[in-house]
Design a protein with these regions (language model features):
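C-terminal accessory regions
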Residues: 95, 99-208
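Conserved helicase motor core of P-loop NTPases
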Residues: 1-116
């Protein structure tokens, strides 16, 4: 069951999100009319599938090769499940990242800039506060009991709707790809943003 999070102060926006949550197709045109068209390079992109996220990530790494990317592999002591807390292989460089989990000095959806790498962890500067912190790998227990260790972050270029849950953004791109295929996916994607004017629709929404 989807529960409303009151991150929107714009009542019209909140009311239309509520209708969208319950499958009202007539509100789709309202979002097309009131959200921005195109793409913002300053915003993260929410996608319906891992495949589309992978396309965005590969393009970002290729276009920004000068950020000196390297691949950081997860460590685990058993078999992996379909649902992982963060990706098994993360490409990171001297670039902007987003946290995917809550920690003592950061929370899910926070952005930061990577400053340096060391054996002790990754030094980042938090975007909102300017504070410099060191981030270590986190360890999770998967549903099958496997211990899974990885950095709790991703490149700040694209994430799936699933990974975006619980996040709040001032600005976001939404790429529907071939369509949001699960009930409530579009609602979750649209409701991550505080205002409709912070939403950039890569493609116009379609009624299904």
């Amino acid at each position: 069951m989807l529960h409303q999070v009151h991150r929107q102060e714009d009542k019209r926006f909140a009311d239309h999100l509520e209708l969208l949550k319950y499958g009202c197709k007539s509100v789709v045109q309202w979002f097309n009319d009131n959200c921005c068209r195109g793409f913002s390079y300053d915003a993260i992109t929410i996608c319906p599938t891992n495949e589309l996220v992978k396309e965005y990530t590969e393009r970002y790494v290729k276009e920004n090769w000068h950020y000196c990317f390297d691949t950081y592999e997860a460590e685990y002591d058993g078999s992996l499940t379909d649902e992982l807390p963060v990706e098994q292989n993360i490409q990171l460089g001297l670039c902007r990242i987003m946290f995917l989990w809550n920690g003592k000095q950061y929370k899910r959806g926070d952005f930061a800039m990577i400053e340096s790498f060391s054996d002790d962890g990754i030094d980042v500067t938090m975007e909102k506060t300017g504070e410099r912190i060191q981030v270590q790998r986190e360890t999770w227990t998967l549903t099958n009991g496997t211990k899974y260790t990885q950095y709790p972050m991703c490149l700040a270029c694209a994430i799936t709707v699933h990974k975006a849950q619980g996040c709040t953004f001032d600005e976001v791109n939404i790429d529907r790809g071939n369509g949001f295929w699960m009930p409530g996916q579009l609602y979750v994607a649209m409701s991550r943003c505080r205002t409709p004017y912070g939403i950039h629709l890569v493609k116009p929404l379609k009624e299904k």
